[in-house]
Amino acid sequence: EIPVSYPSLSEQKSIAAILTSFDDKIELLQAQNKTLEELAQTIFKEWFAKYKVGDKLPDGWGVGKLSEFGKIICGKTPSKSNEDYFGNDIPFIKIPDMHNKVFILETTDNLSIEGAKSQNNKMLPKNSICISCIATVGLVSITTKKSQTNQQINSIIPNENYFREFLYFTLTKMKNYLNDLGSGGTATLNVNTSTFSNIELVKPKEDIIKDFHKLSNPIFEKVLQNNTQIQTLTKTRDALLPKLMSGEIRVKK
């Protein structure tokens, strides 16, 4: 038999209490984010969602193409034959990085400075809005730092900072429409950059978009703050667990 050491029962209970405190805090922040996102979405629906392209619009409102709200960028993957193009410098966003995330805090892959410079025209600044447009269509997320994406993602760099929340919710509610646009009689959904750029949407008066930004921006910033805290708590908990179980870190009984 191989002897196995393990913490005493009282120490196991202390370890469980520590880990539970992390889980409870994470769940609390996740619940808070859900409430905050629903609040911002409710305000958006009340202000904007009742109007569609083709409807009679309020005075001063109109219809504009998506490209009128910002610069459209289609992502690209650097040559994989050059290993120097990949590293830990620039987040490289792919569709799995976007699932159920308002903000993209981390990515599974990253580019080197050299790799990013090889396609510098694909660089996205912070607060760009990414939309998945091939295969899995209609996911919408916001960048939190300078990033690039692969070719399955179209992004918009808003012309004005106060467009961010309006564009996020406008694009989020277009999921079914984007799926219809991308069907094209093929098995794989694909909304190409030209089609994406020419999507028409209701264009409210700019001062109304600004007012919505004033209300929703603090909500989005709180969601981002909570997400950052969740990320830190999760990494700390996961790093602590093996050390607690191995006895490398001991807790008082």
Model-derived regions, located:
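Hydrophobic positions within alpha-helical membrane elements
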Residues: V102, K252-K253
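DNA target-recognition domains and sequence-specific DNA-contacting regions of bacterial/archaeal
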Residues: E1-Y6, P58, G62-P204
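Non-catalytic DNA-recognition/assembly elements of restriction-modification systems
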Residues: P3-T77, F92, P96, V202, ...
